[in-house]
Amino acid sequence: ERDTGHTGNFFNILWSLPGVAQSGPNATGAWMQEFGAWYFDLARRWDGSFPHQGPPEVDGDSYEGWDCTGGYLLAYAMPLKKIYLTGKHPGVAPQLAVAAAQALILDGRGWSNKDRNIAYDKLSEDQLFERLGSWSPVVRERAAMALARRKEVPIPPLLKMLESAALDSRYGACQALIALRGRGAPAIETLRKSLAERDLWLRIKAAEALASIGIPAMQTVPELLTLLAQVDKENDPRGMQQRYLCFALFDSGGEHGVGMLNRSLDGVNRELLDQAVRAGLKNQDGRARGAIGSVYWNLSAEDLKPLLPDIYQAIVEPAPSGEMFADSIRVEGLRLLAKLRIEEGIGACVKYTRDQNPWDSQERTPELMKILLSYGAHAKSVIPELTKIADYFEKEEKNFPKELMIMKAKCVRETIRAIEASTESPELIRLK
C-alpha cells in the first residue's frame, strides 16, 4: 500500500519515515521491520544511490528518472535528530508502546492494490463484525465492503452496534449499512435517531447510511435538509456536516454515490430545500458546493427565482478550499444564468474565464465561451475584455503548456468573431 499513491509513490516514500517517526522509536522499528528495511535495501543501486522506483506500469510516470537519494537519506538520518524534519524538536504525537505499534502493523495487513478483497473475504462473519469496531476507519471500511459482498448479512447485530457505548462500533455499523445499501432498510429508524447524536462524525455516517439505503429512507429527507442548513461555527467551523450532507442529498455519483435528491425534487418541502441550498452554496468546500448543482436542473425557472442571488454569489465568490473541484458549481451556475437570460451572467462569465483555475482550463474555456455566445449580440459589450484575455492566454499565462495556451486563445478569438457576427438579442433579466 505504501508503494502506491494517487500521484505515484514518490511522496509516499519521501514522507513515510518522517511521518511514522512522530509516534516514536517503537513505531519506526515496527514499520522498518514490516516494510522499510527490505524496501530500502532493494531500492539502493550498486553505487549507493536511490533512483525513483515508479509504479509497476511506468507509462506516463512524470517522476521517471528522478534521483531520490536525498529522500531515502532523510529517512536514514532520523536517529541523528539534527533538523526539525528528523526530530530535532520533540513531536506532540503520542509515543507508541511496542504492542500498540505492532497492532497498527496488523491492522494494515490483508490488502494490496493488486488484490484488495481476498484476505478480508477469507475472514469469518464474526471476524468481520469485530473489525467493524476497529479504531481505524480503513479497517472498518474494508470489513464493511467484505460483508456487503456476501449474500446473507444479519442486520440485528448491526442494530445492536448502532446503540453501542463505543463510538467506533457505531461508526462501523454505519459503514456496513452504507455498503449494504438497500439491504440496510431495517436500520432506518435507528439511523434516524443517530442524526440527533452529539457526535459530529456519527451524525455524518448515519446520514450517509440513510442516503445509501435510498428510496426506503426518503422519509428522512426533511431531517437531512434541516441538518444541512445548520451552521455551528463553534463545533463545526468548516461545515463538515454540511459538506457530507451535500453529497448525501445532491451528489451525482462517484465515491459518495448518487444523492437522494439528485434525480428528482418531487414532494420535497420547498422551504427546507431552499434553506439547504443556500447553506450548501456557502460551504467552504468547492466539491460540496458542486453537488448542489443538480438542484439547478430539477427545479422550474419560477422555483429557481428566489435562489438566483445565491447562485450568482456562488459563481463570483469561489469556495476557499476544494479548488480542484470548485469549477463545477461556478460553470453550472453560469450555464443556468445563460439559460434564464440573466444579464449579470455575461460579466460573471468573462471574469471567471480570466480568473479560472488553470488546471484543465483548456477544456473549461470552450464551455465558458459557448455559454457566453448564447447571449448573442448582448455579449458585444465585453469584446474588449475578451481580446485582453485572448492575449493573456497566448502570451502571458505562466506555468501552463504553450500549445494549450494557444488553444485557449484561439477559442476566445473565435468566440469574439461569432459574437461580432451575431444578430440575436434575447430579452435579458436583471437580478437587481
Predicted regions and their residues:
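Solvent-exposed loop and edge beta-strand segments that line ligand/cofactor-binding
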Residues: 1-13, 23-26, 51-67, 196, ...
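Ordered, small/hydrophobic-rich secondary-structure cores
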Residues: 2-38, 135, 154-155, 161-168, ...
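Polyanion-binding and phosphate-handling cores
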Residues: 5-8, 38-42, 57-62, 67, ...
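Terminal, non-catalytic domain-edge segments
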Residues: 11-14, 18-128, 410-432
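Structural detector for internal amphipathic alpha-helices that build alpha-solenoid repeat scaffolds
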Residues: 18, 22, 108-120, 138-152, ...
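Sec-exported extracytoplasmic/periplasmic mature domains
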Residues: 21-25, 41, 45, 77, ...
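Amphipathic alpha-helical scaffolding segments comprising HEAT/armadillo-like alpha-solenoid repeats
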Residues: 121-131, 151-163, 183-196, 216-230, ...
